[in-house]
């Protein structure tokens, strides 16, 4: 049966958040798939209950073989935004191996639960937990709830993202930051910083942190040069908090808002953050830090806010003209490779795949690999999420 973490106390999000999801004030662990689990879930408490092990070999323990030799335990991977698209496909690919227990960290708990069922993920192979990256309080609550569940953390995948390509006015997170950068970068930045402690405690032989990038934020590619191009400028907008009230909602400080550029800029921040994690922590901890572009998933729900004509024409254009189209299932397998494959353990790498689906180390643009800019993004982000 699949271990799930259900909210025991719910509240309306803070004024200013447009995500529309309830925020978890406290979280309790329950078994939530079998009929026994449903009965158990009636005993909702405000305190966290430790659920029985959802798998034969607990994600937190190492079993012994008949010969007495220890065998590798199941790995535990947290994937944000795992209720659809790339995240769900990767969760399914990893769960199907039987070697991974997947924590699906999602804003919409019920949607994620239904998606896992619809994808055919086996009971006991996953845990659904509430996480709203548009609220820094929710990020902290998720970390607390995850620790109360007493699972190890072996791999963290920062995948969730929002994309508002036609937006000409900004929306804001519960903390007052522009939504695209707030969710795609700042929420993940806080999550990753807080969970570093858990990654460092893991006894798993190959601990990893994976941050999903995008070709659109990499200006040394054709796609990265499609206007508006990603550019962080001097970061004065980020330094001002991206509030739009007393300054700009754009990272580079531009007074006019462009939703497509805000997304691209957020992905540059993702790739810079990965490299800064690598510089600060890899040598000391041995943790692998990497990013990736799995290919153009032209049918993903990420494009749901684009104009209808684009949604109609973009998939066949990618399939038959650019030849860059990748299905959600294939993209999920590629992300799963970065999570689990022994050959992809090099740290500080931005992974891509060629037309034969072979992985390779891709080259990042100057904008997405500038170490000084990465340091500044890190330090400004620390202030915005309350770590400095």
UniProtKB/Swiss-Prot annotation:
Signal peptide: none annotated. Keywords: Chlorophyll biosynthesis, Chloroplast, NADP, Oxidoreductase, Photosynthesis, Plastid, Transit peptide. GO terms for molecular function: protochlorophyllide reductase activity. It catalyses: chlorophyllide a + NADP(+) = protochlorophyllide a + NADPH + H(+). InterPro entries: NAD(P)-bd_dom_sf, Prochl_reduct, SDR_fam. GO terms for biological process: chlorophyll biosynthetic process; photosynthesis. Residues 48-69 are annotated as: Disordered. It is found in: Plastid, Chloroplast. Residues 48-68 have a biased composition (Low complexity). SUPFAM superfamilies: NAD(P)-binding Rossmann-fold domains. GO terms for cellular component: chloroplast. Its EC number is 1.3.1.33. Pathway: Porphyrin-containing compound metabolism; chlorophyll biosynthesis. The keyword Plastid applies. PANTHER family: PROTOCHLOROPHYLLIDE REDUCTASE A, CHLOROPLASTIC, PROTOCHLOROPHYLLIDE REDUCTASE C, CHLOROPLASTIC. Phototransformation of protochlorophyllide (Pchlide) to chlorophyllide (Chlide). This is Protochlorophyllide reductase A, chloroplastic. It comes from Hordeum vulgare (Barley). The lineage of its organism: Eukaryota, Viridiplantae, Streptophyta, Embryophyta, Tracheophyta. The gene is PORA.
């Amino acid at each position: 049966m699949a271990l799930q973490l259900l909210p025991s106390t719910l509240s309306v999000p803070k004024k200013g958040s447009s995500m529309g999801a309830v925020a978890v004030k406290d979280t309790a662990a329950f078994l939530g798939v079998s009929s026994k689990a449903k009965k158990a879930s009636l005993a909702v408490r405000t305190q966290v209950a430790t659920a029985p092990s959802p798998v034969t070999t607990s994600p937190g323990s190492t079993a012994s073989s008949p010969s007495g030799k220890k065998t590798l335990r199941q790995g535990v991977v947290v994937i944000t935004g795992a209720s659809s698209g790339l995240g769900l496909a990767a969760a399914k690919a990893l769960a199907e191996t039987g070697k991974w227990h997947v924590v699906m960290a999602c804003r919409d708990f019920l949607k994620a639960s239904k998606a896992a069922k619809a994808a055919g993920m086996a009971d006991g192979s996953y845990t659904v937990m509430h996480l709203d990256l548009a609220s820094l309080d929710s990020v902290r609550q998720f970390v607390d709830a995850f620790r109360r569940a007493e699972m190890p953390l072996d791999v963290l995948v920062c995948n969730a993202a929002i994309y508002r390509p036609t937006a000409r006015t900004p929306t804001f997170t519960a903390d007052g930051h522009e939504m695209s950068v707030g969710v795609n970068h700042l929420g993940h930045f806080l999550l990753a910083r807080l969970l570093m402690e858990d990654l460092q405690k893991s006894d798993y032989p190959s601990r990893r942190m994976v941050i999903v990038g995008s070709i659109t934020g990499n200006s040394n590619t054709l796609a990265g040069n499609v206007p508006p191009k990603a550019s962080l400028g001097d970061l004065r907008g980020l330094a001002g908090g991206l509030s739009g009230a007393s300054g700009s909602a754009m990272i580079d400080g531009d007074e006019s808002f462009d939703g497509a550029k805000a997304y691209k800029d957020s992905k540059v921040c993702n790739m810079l953050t990965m490299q800064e994690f690598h510089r600060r922590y890899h040598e000391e901890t041995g943790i692998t830090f990497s990013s990736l572009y799995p290919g153009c998933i032209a049918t993903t729900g990420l494009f749901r806010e684009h104009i209808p004509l684009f949604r109609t024409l973009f998939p066949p254009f990618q399939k038959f003209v650019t030849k860059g189209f990748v299905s959600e299932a294939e993209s999920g397998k590629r992300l799963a490779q970065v999570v689990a494959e022994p050959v992809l353990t090099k740290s500080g790498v931005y992974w891509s795949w060629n037309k034969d689906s072979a992985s390779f180390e891709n080259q990042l643009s100057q904008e997405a690999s500038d170490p000084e800019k990465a340091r500044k993004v890190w330090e400004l982000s620390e202030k915005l999420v309350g770590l400095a």
